[in-house]
A protein has these predicted regions:
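Bacterial N-terminal signal peptides that target proteins for export
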Residues: 1-9
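Short secondary-structure boundary/capping elements
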Residues: 35, 64, 250-254
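A cross-kingdom marker for long, charged
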Residues: 241-299
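Extracellular/periplasmic catalytic domains that process cell-envelope and extracellular macromolecules
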Residues: 34, 47, 76, 262-264
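N- or domain-start disorder-to-order transition segments that initiate the globular core
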Residues: 23-49
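Structured, acidic catalytic/metal-binding patches in enzyme active sites
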Residues: 39-247
Length: 299
C-alpha cells in the first residue's frame, strides 16, 4: 500500500481560476509580442468583464527554483477559481489514477526491454527511487519514468499544482480541471509501450544527457522563455517528437473551448505545463486567435 501511494503521488505530479468588485491587477506590460518572456499572462477583451490569467508550470521542480512572486499570488487572489490540467483536489484522484496505471493486455516491462536493459533499469530504479522493478513492472512506462524525476532533478521536488490547490483552499476557491485523469492516462495507451520503455532505458544509459537536458529546460523556465522552452520540449532527446500533436497541440485545442467558457463565467487562474504556452498552436496563440488580448505580466 505504501508503495502504491508513492507511485500514484509521483504520477499525479507528472500529469502532471468576472467579479462585480474592482480588482487589484498585477502590472501587465504595455505590449504583447509573441516572444515576450513571462510565465504569467493576462487574458482580457472579447467581452470579459475582468481579466483571467494563464501561468505555465513545471510539474516537478526543486523548491529552490519555485518562484511564488507577488504578481503571481495577486493573480490567484484576483481570480474566483483555479483551473489546472487536472482537478487536483478531487478526493477520488488517487483511485482513478490507480485504476488506469497498468499497461493494457497484461504487458510488463520485462517483456518490452532486453534482459540487459531490464536489469540495468531495475537496479537504477531501486537505487534512485527505492522501487523494486518486479513490483511495478506492469505500470505504464511513462509513469514509471516519473519515479526517477527526483534523481534527474537532484532534489525532492515540489509542485506548483499542489501549491495552487493549497492557495485556492485557503481562499475558499473552487479547483477544476481541463481534462480528466482518464484523459491523461489514456494518452499513454496511444503511444506504443515499447517506445515508452526505450525512454526508460535511455534514462539509465544516457543519464548524463538526460540531466543536461533537464537543466537546459529548467534554465529556460527560470528565464521565462516560453517560446524557447516549447521548442526544446518538442525536440527533446528523450521526448516523443512524433506525438507532439497527441501530447500538446490536440490537447491545447480542446482546452481552449473550456477556458473560454470558464473565463466568461468568472475570472479564472489557469495553470498548465509551460510547454503548452508557446508555439503557433500553443495556448497563448490560440487565445489570441479567438480574439482575446493576451499580455505578459511582469513576474
Amino acid at each position: 500500500m505504501k508503495l502504491l501511494r508513492k507511485t500514484v503521488f509521483a504520477a499525479t505530479l507528472l500529469l502532471t481560476a468576472f467579479g462585480a468588485h474592482a480588482q487589484k491587477k498585477p502590472a501587465a506590460t504595455a505590449a504583447a509580442p509573441a516572444a515576450a518572456n513571462s510565465l504569467l499572462w493576462e487574458v482580457s477583451g472579447k467581452g470579459l468583464s475582468a481579466p483571467s490569467y494563464v501561468f505555465g508550470t513545471m510539474h516537478m521542480i526543486c523548491p529552490a527554483d519555485m518562484q511564488l512572486s507577488e504578481p503571481l499570488k495577486q493573480a490567484v487572489r484576483n481570480s474566483h477559481q483555479v483551473v489546472m490540467e487536472l482537478d487536483m483536489d478531487d478526493p477520488s484522484m488517487a483511485q482513478q489514477m490507480q485504476a488506469g496505471m497498468l499497461m493494457q493486455g497484461g504487458q510488463t516491462l520485462q517483456q518490452l526491454l532486453s534482459a540487459d536493459d531490464y536489469a540495468r533499469f531495475g537496479a537504477y530504479l531501486q537505487t534512485k527511487a527505492g522501487l523494486p522493478v518486479d513490483k511495478v513492472g506492469a505500470i505504464k512506462p511513462f509513469m514509471l519514468g516519473s519515479m526517477l524525476l527526483p534523481a534527474v532533478l537532484g532534489c525532492q521536488p515540489a509542485s506548483y499544482e499542489t501549491t495552487f490547490v493549497q492557495m485556492a483552499q485557503e481562499q475558499k476557491k473552487e479547483v477544476l480541471g481541463l481534462e480528466t485523469v482518464q484523459d491523461q492516462l489514456g494518452l499513454f495507451d496511444k503511444i506504443p509501450y515499447a517506445e515508452q520503455s526505450k525512454m526508460l532505458a535511455d534514462m539509465v544509459n544516457k543519464e548524463t544527457e538526460m540531466k543536461q537536458e533537464m537543466q537546459q529546460l529548467l534554465g529556460l523556465y527560470k528565464a521565462q522563455r516560453v517560446e524557447a522552452l516549447h521548442e526544446l520540449s518538442v525536440k527533446s532527446l528523450f521526448g516523443f517528437t512524433k506525438y507532439n500533436d497527441l501530447l500538446l497541440d490536440a490537447r491545447n485545442q480542446r482546452w481552449i473551448a473550456s477556458m473560454e467558457k470558464l473565463a466568461a463565467a468568472q475570472p479564472t487562474f489557469f495553470a498548465v505545463g509551460a510547454a503548452h504556452l508557446g508555439g503557433p498552436k500553443g495556448v497563448l496563440a490560440l487565445l489570441r486567435q479567438q480574439g482575446y488580448q493576451v499580455r505578459p505580466v511582469a513576474f
